[in-house]
Amino acid sequence: MTEISVKLPHEPYNIQVTVSSQEQVQDVRQSIVELPGTFQYTSFHLEHNGTRINDYIELSEVKDIQANSEVVLVEDPYTEKEARMHVIRIRELIGAAGDRVDNLHGICAGLSLHDSVAAGEQLTDTKEGERGVVRDHALVDYDMTAPPVLQTILPRAQPSLPKTVKAISLSPWNPPPYHLRQRGHLLYLQVTTNEGEQHQITSHVSGFFVNKSSNAKFDPFPRPAPKNYSAHSLLTLISMLSPSFDASFKALQESNNKKDLLTTFPFQNSIPKNPWLVPPTSSAVTAHQSDITRSQENCLIFGVDNSETLRDWNEEFQSTRELPRETVQDKVSRERLTSKLFADYNDAAARGAVLVAKGEIAPLNPTEGKDAQIFVYNNIFFSFGADGVGTFASEGGDEAARVAVGKDVVGAKAVNQLDIPGLFTPGTVVVDYLGKRLVGQSIVPGIFKQREPGEHQIDYGGVEGKEVVAEHKDFVPVFEKLSASLRVKKHPVWDKEGKRHDLEGSVETKGLLGTDGRKYVLDLYRITPLDVAWSEDAEGHEPYPHRMSVLRLELVELYWRYKMGQYVKAEVQKRKTAKREAEKTKAVEAQNEDKAELLSTSDPGEGENKAVASEQERVDISAFKLALNPDVFSGQVPQTDEEKEEWAQDEKEVRSACDHLISKVIPELIQDLHDGDVGFPMDGESLTQLLHKRGINVRYLGKLAKLSQAKGQRLLALTALLIQEMVSRSFKHIANRYLRYLPSPFTASCVSHLLNCFLGAEVNSNPRPEIDEELREIYPEGDFSFEKVTPTSLKGDIEKQIKIRFRFNLEPKWTSSLKHLQLLRDISIKLGLQIGAREFAFERSQIKSQEHSPEPSSTHSSQDERGKRKKKKGSNSDSPSRVAASPRPVVTFVPEDILNIVPLVKDASPRSALAEEALEAGRISIMQNQKEIGQELILESLSLHEQIYGILHPEVAKLYHQLSMLYYQTDEKEAAVELARKAVIVTERTMGVDSADTILSYLNLSLFEHASGNTHTALIYIRHALELWKIIYGSHHPDSITTMNNAAVMLQHLKKYPDSRKWFEASLTVCEGLFGRQSINTATILFQLAQALALDQDSKAAVNRMRDAYNIFLNELGPNDRNTKEAESWLEQLTQNAVSIAKHAKDIQARRLRRTNLSPRMTIGTKPQPQVGQNAPATTNGATSKSIGLDSRSIDELLKFIEGGGESRSPRSKQKKRAAASNPKLRGSKQSTVQTA
């Protein structure tokens, strides 16, 4: 990194910019635009030595440029587009831009709560005028058994920002007439200053000036002196016009600087996460403000004719793929463009899909049935994920079509990731919205072309189902590469006439030669074989909804690795056998030789043996071949005996892969969760991620639940989570069925009624839907079947769906064990609901707090619009819609609670291979103790991630999380805290303020803050994480044992011994519930609790707890185990002199906690959570100071035990032969922590 000097045309006239020689000049431009002294510049170029610098070259390519070189910023004339962008930017800079309302980004999209949490803002209600009690520490009043506080995930009300201008908008005189456009007029603006003066401004190619127009008179030419204000930047012009502007703008900047930049940074390469729970319409946070420019923004962004939105997406995708990839910089530029292009396309496709779903776009084939209609909008081709033309009639109709398009986007993502030269895919996005599934694809040239008679529409693969099969020699090489990467076997298929065709891929995977000469691969929903184990296990079960149940790509890869491992073992065994035979032969020959000769050859013989051993370590796997035939079990009929034999072999291999899933992968996952070897999932999303990573399809939730139940108490939490996920998924399918053909104005009524029948059945066992009959009359073809749903029918429907989809039978009283809030959250996420926050009554006992259901809080709600219309069905004449004095019937949800529904987007964006390679290389270097090289590579990976993805992206959030862990392990705590803080904010904004990843990020941040000496801040983060945990899971999550222990240790560090003791006791309660009273895990916590009790001067209880720990260790591990001996030693000492020991324990604790870079190892055998004392072995070795009256050896060993020292690891971890504490497994590795695999 070097500095260059930038000479400016205005104050401050010169700035220093830190740059990298690998950066493009446009990145340097962006850096200048974002600096406080230069952000008014938008239309400019840079010059060096009087020569203009091209924006699209690397800085290193600029002639004679070096460190401290001077670059000159030269203002350019504006174009109309640049003028519009300048106005938008200045509006945002001066705080004049209101919230945008669009179809894609919902309420509070991309929300971050970090700044509010870090400031320690309390959520407890305090009456107006009362001051909140100053807390000693964040956990002082925390109740672990209290119900969750919904305000935890809501944005806090912020103080109003300083106002810089009253309004800035397009003038009523805009756009300029033709004759003035030719004279350089671009836009006409209207600015009202804080002083109340209104100014008409002309945007000219040369800059901005105040004109002589008024609201009634058009005169867009400059005012005469002395009021002839003009400037190149609108920001500068406004500061000339408004005396108060500079002061208010400075105050606005100071206010913005208090926030972390990442919390307000705009999204560029990803779609922001929409929270499921949002403030109600009455909240100041979401109040709708008057803003004339909001309706003008589309014009400002896209221009008057909207032509800038019309992009040739397909050509952009394919030409980007064809960019050079020889050098590293080529690859960076290519991947960066690819990432941006996919982000833009996903955004455009999602917006278009929403318009199609709402009926805003006219179909190309209006005479066809609704499901068969196709649409083109913004150069994107849209169709419904339904079987409108009978393509999937034999596979399951609409259900099969819905699954197929979902699998297609996964397949497209896999092909995009492989990035095979010469093979192209159309841009593909699947959007679920209002019960409909829509597919958006870029238009492949020639796909709509009418072919000559006798020519097929498709050039390679099945043309009309499987009856006609096309072949094309040009597709063989690229499909061969694709199939090799996806482990797909070249195999024969037969058309309807029995003719054989040898295909590289599935008959369902099609190749199309576009009119642009490129080879496209389409329909990638069958790149893996059918799951024959699932389809053949249908006996005794309801018929599955479709025949599209295929294996996951992850499973195929795992199976390939498993078989390769077997192959390597077999090869090694062969070599060992061959070596033994050779040795025998040599021994026989040696008997006939002279002893001296034997001695003379002994040394070379040893060298030879070493060479053989070395050779054994290297097994050539090029001879290993494993590929699966994706078309077996799908109706293909081999013709000859040879073909039948080959087909039978293919079927056998696929059965073997399916069996691997059933008999090995699934049981191993259950065992790993039982043993605590993987992070325990917290909600449906994290559970699904874990299953998919292991190659397990979601349809196996029922099987997993049965295996989990068989494991008993230890996996009770997992069983409940699996059942909850089955229930929420079944509800999603049912809701989608009712929403699919329902007119959109009734969506809120439908959703609220279904939720009342499901989650509010105890409050009202016979809820009635609220429907405006007059509005209903104008939709005679709408499907209003949801009206007939009752709690009983819905319960039966859910049970039926679970039987069909997951082959699992719920217990008769399953509804009594539901976690209502968690289910509401899961359902909302799966359907894209945004619900207005309030206290929902799920049980009769909660009704007391609300005598009747809440009335709409918004003054512009539906009943005001239709107050005089017919009464709603199910409501009497005293309905609050008509007579405000009377309550509605008591129900849990009302239509006004459903504030919005957002589209759910599945995209095919590939990850950056270059950034991942750099990260992996860095990890390996650090593991090999090459710290400097490793850190350099990791920083390079971070730079690549940020360049390619932009800062706000889930992949960048994961990297920040991983890097923070790596820096913590290498004892660079400040860097670890900074990266962990970034990880929290980016995770909140891209994955959700209450996602499982967000909780992990907050917990890690708390550990790093504590290690850096900021224990009070650490406790604030722990409190927030625990509140989030309550919302997404409830209490007593298996991982919470570790967090509670960490909190207890932090409180000990603050010398809050009574509070610390409470947290150890809470941890013990959860541990006993999960692992039983007599488990080693419980004994480990009892040991720590005894310490805490001694510190709290409760000597009697300390002795009792230590005795309990000793007895468990003795029974479970025997008298000779180190843990038993330590517990016995401490028990004796505590018993001999309890008071004295308490005093000495205090001294020990003081010495231990002064070393803030460590804390107890808290995994206690439950799960691989990031441990506070990760580098404890290195730091505890020096703790040799002796304590009076205690055996120093015992004390040091105890320190190692409770801090996670290497010798005193958790007993069960010894039995499991796990890695030493210096290389611990990290919690959440399934999602977002360091993985070295």
Swiss-Prot record:
Domain Clu: 291-535
Cross-referenced Gene3D superfamilies: Tetratricopeptide repeat domain
Highest taxon of source: Eukaryota
GO molecular function per UniProt: mRNA binding
Comp. bias intervals (Polar residues): 1156-1187
Chief location bin: cytoplasm
Matches recorded under InterPro entries: CLU-central, CLU_dom, CLU_N, CLU_prot, GSKIP_dom_sf, TPR-like_helical_dom_sf, TPR_rpt
TPR repeat ranges, renumbered to this chain: 957-990, 999-1032, 1041-1074
UniProt-annotated stretches for the region Disordered: 575-614, 845-886, 1152-1189, 1201-1237
Biased composition (Basic and acidic residues): 575-597, 845-854
The keyword Cytoplasm appears for this protein: yes
Keyword list, A-Z: Cytoplasm, Repeat, TPR repeat
UniProt keyword Ribosomal protein, yes or no: no
A biological process from GO: intracellular distribution of mitochondria
Cellular component GO terms held in the UniProt record: cytoplasm
Location in the cell: Cytoplasm
PANTHER family (alphabetical): CLUSTERED MITOCHONDRIA PROTEIN HOMOLOG (PTHR12601:SF6), EUKARYOTIC TRANSLATION INITIATION FACTOR 3 SUBUNIT EIF-3 (PTHR12601)
Record function comment: mRNA-binding protein involved in proper cytoplasmic distribution of mitochondria.
The protein's assembly and partners: May associate with the eukaryotic translation initiation factor 3 (eIF-3) complex.
Family, similarity comment: Belongs to the CLU family.
Official protein name in the record: Clustered mitochondria protein homolog
Organism: Ajellomyces capsulatus (strain NAm1 / WU24) (Darling's disease fungus)
